[in-house]
Curated annotation (Swiss-Prot):
Family recorded in the similarity comment: Belongs to the UPF0182 family.
Species, as recorded: Mycobacterium tuberculosis (strain CDC 1551 / Oshkosh)
Keyword Iron found: no
Keywords, in A-Z order: Cell membrane, Membrane, Transmembrane, Transmembrane helix
PANTHER family listed in its UniProt record: UPF0182 PROTEIN SLL1060
Membrane-traversing stretches: 19-41, 63-85, 114-136, 174-196, 208-230, 261-280, 285-307
Segments for region (Disordered): 894-948
Subcellular location: Cell membrane
GO cellular component terms, A-Z: extracellular region; plasma membrane
Protein name per its UniProtKB record: UPF0182 protein MT0070
Length: 979
């Protein structure tokens, strides 16, 4: 073994150097290889969907941020290290036994450049990588414009607060980080080389160390002065007065704002005092200035606003906060589009004055009453329309409308998707799972206002073939038959909500020309994908990349993969939109529609902000539960617009973004940042526009805000007396709020069917109905909100009270006992419908599901009864309840004979309903024929009574009840002591 000369470092043998190099290469590959694979796959995928420009723009923006921040941080830190090193003392006392940093100093002295550059570059790169997540702020700053609205305090355009201010704050934060790191680096370097020595009872600083540390400390304080200046503008989004209102209140404007200016001045003086240390040896002046700044921050910035809030504002809050509440009301209405330009308020009595059959609008509403609940019927769809075990429908179905033979009809719709979780046995083999079972089959719809037949026999209701949807199926089997109610030319579904539940989510499709198809299509046919979607894996490099990404060697050795093969990834419609437009927030509920013969997913997308001055903060997304069980509030926003409608083709995965709000300055900013990615509103096809729905997530935010922001007067707003609440869901034991519901109702002007999203509202901490909010989805009036306000001096029952009244009705209670012997009962969506020229009609379907003890048997809900309720005329709180197998019979019970004749009767086909009373049972597809036992005939109803006579009798009874109520109250008052 050779030894080097004394003083020289030992040299590794060649073999050892090779091993070290190989080891470092393997380590680098393990660290950076997966990320490089992801980058290359993203490059391929974004190119496939036609949005590679988005990927490149985001990547270049993040790289530019990394470079800029790394350069600034590394440069400042390196300068600090270099200055400290060059100004080190030439003589350091050689006392190793008393100098604990001597070994470290020796190591640094051997390689000073490596340590200096290494520390600076490492810190710079780490800071740059963290800062790259602020790419959204950079793009908004570079491309942001104006709103044309100024804030009420400083008079600046809103664009300054949402586009510029976040960027300035981010730049300031990173400068602050850089200077603090430089200060620490300088401090440690001076300590290491003796410029700073700590001895018993005192410390010693060289002049160079004192100057450098003072300059960096002064720079930190100077940056803090700039931060105080920017804090002034951020007060307009203050949360001090939450939950009452968001934005600067009296204390913020009269205490916090002046305090910030005072602190700016003190911080500047403090910084100057630090800079004087360059000339003065005495550090007591900077120390006293720093103490003054800290004390001022506590007293002026903290204690003074606290005292003002406690002793001046709170005792007089209703008066002193009035102008600031007014600012909050105006800003919130603008930010969420719930102001007078978008919301129409109408007084509504809450008590009907006419028979619904005599009001054209009500005739339309009753004929279109939705009886099918998309939250309940998914299992019914699956059991009756599944075809194969590996097909399934979404857990919650969707509601849409189609015009069939000139008539607008709402349908419960779903896509028969491939369900990876449903594969069993050999179906789960890799070849079968990813190359054979690749797609779903068909679009299934059912008219929402009727079922095949009424279920009458309560004792044998689960054995009857009644209460099931009437299906309109558009799939491979019906392709080209001419029998499709909703024509679909390409029923195969490769992209969907259910199909994307595989982990990992991918399918391998395609084949060489002339090769035998292998994808399952039907029991008698196979198929080869011919769509434009998918990333090519025809070459060995791409196959190796995907084999690495999903950790599956079969990509390399399977004979099923050839030169024409492609892999379909990211098959969830919502995820695809989020990836191609990362600057948008997507709605949680994509829904399928048929447009020009193709199945297309529509995804509502929002532009959002969280710094809109004075606008109330709200959550656009629901609470998020972490894996550890911690519940966190969803993303908080102060501005939201449904500015983009996105579509995803279910066959080839094509993503298209359409501008839907030309007036949104945030969308205009993003369209400048990513030109060509969003198509103009003029390019939306009329057939597609006809299926746009008002999104549920946005509506839920708006209705919760309208519960407060319908109030105009700030003092009344502060007292909360006129507030509303979103009612609890009476059909959900989890005490959740009642979800909004889509309905077809008669338009007030034309009496034609109008598709709307609606919700009842109750009084604040009460259960009586206070308002009814509906959002139009028809193209002509899309986005218009209508609010029907009920008087506060009359009592109209809310959803929870109506539910209690209906289930406590003697007829309902007695039959429920009978039904529950062999069935589970599901209460469907409780619909609130304006009707009878001022009244409110509640309709609730009741579903039963047979209880089975056999694990092999399948049960699913069927519509068994319909409950309706209306307020009793001329009474305080009285209600009428209807309960029958059909809507028509229930309506006759509450309105008298004749009203039920305008309801849609059971039966018919999916394209057209039978005339009232003409519907007979028609077995739905996939359901076995009914048993031979016939349901008992309905009991005789007796002689018909003229409707006028019935109405007179009801009015007389109502008058008698009112008299008895008043008499009972008088007796109670007389018996009460002191009364």
């Amino acid at each position: 073994m050779e030894t080097g000369s004394p003083g020289k470092r030992p040299v590794l043998p060649k073999r050892a150097r090779l091993l070290v190099t190989a080891g470092m290469g393997m380590l680098a590959l393990l660290l950076f290889g997966p990320r490089l694979v992801d980058i290359y796959v993203d490059w391929l995928w974004f190119g496939e969907v036609g949005f590679r420009s988005v990927w490149i723009t985001v990547l270049l923006t993040r790289l530019a941020i990394v470079a800029a921040v790394a350069l600034v941080v590394a440069g400042i830190v390196l300068a600090a290290l270099l200055l400290a090193y060059r100004s080190r003392p030439f003589f350091v006392p050689d006392e190793p036994q008393r100098d604990p940093v001597a070994p470290l100093r020796s190591a640094v002295m051997r390689r000073p450049r490596l340590f200096g550059w290494g520390i600076a570059v490492t810190l710079g790169v780490v800071c740059g990588l963290i800062a790259s997540f602020d790419w959204v702020k950079v793009q908004l700053f570079v491309h942001g414009g104006t709103f044309g609205i100024v804030d009420p305090e400083f008079g600046y355009d809103i664009g300054f607060f949402v586009f510029d201010l976040p960027f300035y704050r981010s730049v300031l934060n990173w400068l602050f980080v850089a200077v603090v790191l430089a200060f620490l680096a300088s401090l440690l370097t001076h300590y290491l080389f003796g410029g700073l020595r700590l001895t018993t009872g005192r410390g010693m600083l060289t002049q160079a160390a004192r100057v450098q540390l003072a300059v960096f400390a002064g720079a930190v304080v100077l940056l803090k002065a700039v931060a105080y200046w920017l804090d002034r503008y951020e007060l307009l989004s203050s949360g001090r007065k939450e939950p009452t209102f968001t934005g600067a209140g009296y204390t913020d404007i009269h205490a916090e704002l002046p305090a910030k200016l005072v602190l700016v001045a003190i911080a500047v003086l403090c910084a100057v005092s630090f800079f004087t240390a360059i000339f003065l040896r005495d550090l007591r002046i900077p120390a006293m200035a720093a103490a003054l700044l800290v004390l001022s921050a506590i007293l002026v910035g903290g204690l003074w606003p606290l005292l003002m809030e406690q002793f001046s504002v709170r005792p007089n809050a209703a008066d002193v906060e009035r102008p600031y509440i007014q600012r909050n009301i105006e800003a919130t209405r603008e930010a969420y589009r719930i102001g007078g330009d978008w919301v129409q308020y109408r007084s509504y009595p809450g008590i009907g004055t006419k028979q619904p059959r005599d009001v054209p609008v009500d005739v339309t509403t009753i004929a279109k009453v939705r009886l099918l609940d998309p939250h309940i019927l998914s299992r019914t769809f699956t059991q009756q329309q599944q075809l194969k075990n590996f097909f399934s429908f979404a857990e919650i179905l969707d509601i849409d409308r189609y015009r069939i033979d000139g008539e607008l009809q709402d349908y419960i719709v779903g896509v028969r998707e491939f369900s990876p979780k449903s594969l069993t046995g050999n179906q789960t083999d890799w070849i079968n799972k990813h190359t054979v079972y690749t797609h779903g089959n068909g679009f299934v719809a059912a008219p929402a206002n009727r079922v095949n037949a009424a279920a009458r026999d309560a004792e044998n209701i689960s054995d009857s073939n009644s209460g099931y949807p009437i299906y309109a199926v558009s799939d491979i089997a019906s392709l080209g038959s001419g029998r499709q109610v909703i024509p679909v030319e390409q029923p195969r579904v490769y992209y969907g909500e259910v199909i994307a539940q595989a982990d990992p989510d991918y399918a391998i499709v395609g084949g060489a020309p002339g090769s035998a198809p292998r994808e399952y299509d039907t029991d008698t046919s196979k198929y080869t994908y011919t769509g434009a979607g998918g990333v090519s894996i025809g070459n060995w490099f791409n196959r190796t990349v995907f084999a690495t990404k999903v950790a599956q060697h079969k990509f390399l050795f399977s004979r099923e993969i050839g030169s024409e093969s492609k892999v379909l990834i990211h098959r969830d419609p919502k995820e695809r939109v989020q990836r191609v437009a990362p600057w948008l927030t997507t709605d949680d509920n994509p829904y399928p529609v048929v447009v020009n013969g193709r199945i297309v997913w529509i995804v509502d997308a929002y532009t959002t902000l969280d710094t809109y001055p004075y606008a109330q903060r709200s959550s656009l997304e629901g609470p998020v539960t972490s894996p550890t069980g911690i519940v966190r509030q969803g993303k908080q926003v102060s501005y939201v617009r449904n500015s983009v409608k996105a579509t995803v083709d279910a066959y080839d995965g094509t993503v298209t973004l359409f501008q839907f709000d030309r007036d949104d300055p945030v969308l205009r900013t993003w369209m400048r940042a990513f030109p060509g990615t969003v198509k103009s509103e003029d390019q939306i096809p009329d057939e597609l526009r006809a299926h746009f729905r008002y999104p549920e997530d946005l509506f839920e935010v708006q209705r919760s805000l309208l519960a407060k922001y319908h109030v105009d007067e700030p003092r009344e707003f502060f007292t909360t007396n006129a507030f509303w609440s979103v009612p609890s869901d009476p059909t959900n034991d989890a005490n959740a709020t009642q979800p909004p519901f889509y309905v077809l109702v008669g338009d007030q002007q034309s009496a034609q069917p109008s598709f709307r999203l609606a919700s009842a509202m109750v009084g604040y901490n009460r259960e009586f109905l206070s308002a009814y909010i509906s959002a139009h989805s028809d193209p002509a009036n899309y986005g218009k909100l209508t609010v029907l306000e009920l008087p506060t001096d009359t009592l109209t029952q809310g959803p929870q009270q109506i539910q209690n009244s209906m289930i406590s009705d003697t007829r309902v209670a007695s039959e429920r006992t009978l039904l529950e012997r062999s069935n589970r009962i599901h209460y469907g969506n409780l619909l609130s419908l304006p009707i009878a020229d001022g009244g409110v009609l509640y309709v609730e379907p009741l579903y039963t599901e047979r209880i089975s003890t056999s694990p092999s048997s399948s049960t699913f809900p069927q519509l068994s009864r319909v409950l309706v309720s209306v307020r009793e005329p001329r009474t305080e709180g009285g209600v009428r309840v209807g309960y029958a197998p059909t809507l028509a019979e229930s309506l006759d019970q509450v309105f008298g004979p004749g009203t039920g004749r305008v309801a849609t009767x059971p039966g018919g086909d999916a394209a057209s309903a039978p005339p009232p009373g003409a519907g007979g049972p028609a077995p739905p597809q996939g359901v076995p024929p009914p048993r031979t036992t016939q349901p008992p005939a309905a009991p005789p109803r007796g002689p018909d009574v003229p409707p006028a006579t019935v109405a007179e009798l009801r009015e007389t009874l109502a008058d008698l009840r009112a008299v008895l109520d008043r008499l009972e109250k008088a007796i109670d008052a007389a018996e009460t002591p002191g009364g």
